[in-house]
Amino acid sequence: MSVIDSFGMLIAKKWIAGEDLQHAIQEAKRINSHKESVIMNYLGEDLKSKKLVEQNMDQLMQLLDQMHSKKIKGSIAVKPTQTGLIVSTSYFEKNYSMILAKAQRYGITVWLDMEQYRFVPSTINTYLKFHKQYKNTGVCIQAKLKRSLKDVERIAKHNGMVRLVKGAYKYPSTIAFQDKRDVYNNYLRCMEYLFSHADKFMIASHDDKIIKIAINSEKKYHKRIAFGMLKGVRSSLAAKIAESEDMNIYLPYGEEWIKYSMRRLSEWEHTKIIIRSIIQG
């Protein structure tokens, strides 16, 4: 029995699709059957050797092949440090372009996830560099960072695509908002700018007020945007939104689930939502 099937992994199982691609594809099919798309994420980060990066690249290429052959409706998310950024920027760019090329042939969008603050500039720069050639890619922006509104403005200016999230990483007060009200307000500022200046973007939030404002803004600006939520978090709300909106469920899988789970558990607001989701089933 795999560790993810053990009693101690009850909470992780709420978020994680499984430890292997087969289980992840099965879960993706189930989600697709509910008229929801998926953002599939093979878990991995902070890789310091080419050997580990190449192992992850093999998994990501298999993921794209399986999504195509099994007709999975959705996109994938990859982390820069999973695909070689710590080794070198040029190595990361080479791997990112390989992923984009294959994904483009399959009609699959690739999201660049955002990581620790020191990787933000290189992530955005690389995204904008390859966005010129590949239109099937977007980048994640964390509203808790004080710099994010300027990043959103820059990306929108280049017709890029943003997936706006609150952010799960811990940052000092010099670079990030600490009060949840400030994070909320910055999220709204970034979202308003996207509605005013961008054609395609995703609002990834479990917050009722943010979702309501986004739906009302669709009517105000005559736009159809995408919404995103985490697997196993407020699933009934996601299903309700999916009745009339483009809902995308973030679907992580793989053996490296610990860091991802710890980040989620470190957020009290997320933890309350997840505990409620587990109790309610």
Locate the predicted segments by residue.
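Positively charged, amphipathic and often flexible ligand-engagement surfaces
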Residues: M1-G281
